[in-house]
Amino acid sequence: MAIRHDQVLAVARRVIDRADREHPADLALRLVLREERGLTRGEYARTSEAVFAYYRWHGWLKETDPLPDQINSALELMEVFQNEPGSFPEDELCDRAVPAWVKEEIEVTPGWANALQSLPSLWLRAKKGQGASLMQSLGLAEPAGPGDLSDALRYFGPEDLFRIPDFRAGTFELQDLSSQMVGLICAPKPGETWWDACAGEGGKALHLSDLMENKGLLWVSDRAEWRLRK
């Protein structure tokens, strides 16, 4: 079934209109998509892509344009950058990829700006010691590195991972590599006590628990109460 672009734009607009300090874009996206019963799987994916393209390329957009036009412009910029990243001058990327206040606090390098504008990889966290078997089961995946990093897999296949048996069986979680590194750096041991002071929706806490073999005490807290309620 063809993707209905007008429908995608309408839903993406609802997400952006709903997003605020108390409802970050990822939460607003989940809430709106939960309410949308008539979208195809492809339209769900395209809506997510449109929302995050809008925020990723916000520094290039004209705020006086109607929101649907801004979203379309962001999608066009995203496609150009994917195909020809060198067509964006380094000084332009450094200037527009982050808000002005960021440049007052830290140096914005071309490498960082390029990374911010690139589509993120999809990272999975396998159960401890199960990275190799999960990679064989999924196919189209590769480990982040040797040793402990072998349980962190970058997935580049077409499957909806939330629907496959391995996910439903709890064999892996979807978790960004930087978040996985937190647990590996902590390297908790079974029987220890740890406090996750920025628990969010629990991904890092679950990783700590897995590394502790579910033996010990784990406290979790977060400034955003709604994240803990999830």
Segments from the language model and where they lie:
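S-adenosylmethionine
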Residues: 1-230
